[in-house]
Structures are given as C-alpha cells and as structure tokens.
C-alpha cells in the first residue's frame, strides 16, 4: 500500500499500510451513557461533539466499539485470564490467520485488504447472510465502502469460528461494529 502526494508538479510515494486505533469520549463531559454518573451535557453539545467525526472519516474506520467504564471494585480484583482462556483465544487467532494464509496462498494479504472486486472470490456469503446484509444496507443507509467493510470483518469473524462461509451471525456481529453511539 502506498499513498501518492502531489505538490508543485512533483509526486511523492510513501508507504501507507497502518492500523489506526483511536479513542474518544461519548460527549464533552465524558459521561453520556454512563451507568453511574449522569451526563451534564445538553443534547446539542453532544451532537456537536459527535459531529467532529465526519461521516466520510467514520466510513473509513472498519470497527467502532463502545467501551463502558470499568467499576473500581472490578479494577482492584485484577483477575487476569486463566491459561486455558488465553490458550483458546490464541488458538482461535492462529487458526484464523492460517485460514487467511491458505485463502491467499501464503501471501501477506489479509481479509481487511480485500478489494471489492475480490469479495465474491474470497468471501462467500450464505444466501441468508446476503439477505441480511442487503436489508441492513438499506435500513442503515450503508455506503458502498461500509458495505464491503462489513463483509471483510464478517470474513474474519467466520475465520475465527473456523467457518468457510460467512453466515448470518457473522454479518450480524460485523454490523454491530459499524454502529456508533449517537444521542
């Protein structure tokens, strides 16, 4: 992956493969949707705050996840995952990576880098999954970019579950990652 910058009749190419991880509060005070503290923001303050992330920018983010504040008592318990839980997660990830290596003939390609023209070849959807995606795309007004991101994330979810085909639960879970909390 590269990015080309054109300036003063010159073109410069730079590598551009990266992973963006970002965080933000749900509102200016940080407590919108909090179970323990009340938000002190007005609806218009929340809306204006959330509009700082434009639709086109959000459209380029594969997954959004709302993370609630962790209770202090739980933080103090500090219970790490046990070895069997860690092993199960690690095995699932390794298996998903193995599926991707097989799918792409051991290349460095991953599901997230699929082009829209490659979706039919590498990301088979069951008829039910396709119907769910089409209905969701209409009701959620998904852009073309978001539509294909849902499929690519669902392909990875299916890989984690050792499924050759993307089924309805994979699409449903992937769609949940396209949602962002708005007031």
Question: Where on the chain are the PLM-derived regions?
Answer:
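Basic, amphipathic alpha-helical bundle interface domains used for macromolecular binding and assembly
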Residues: 1-183
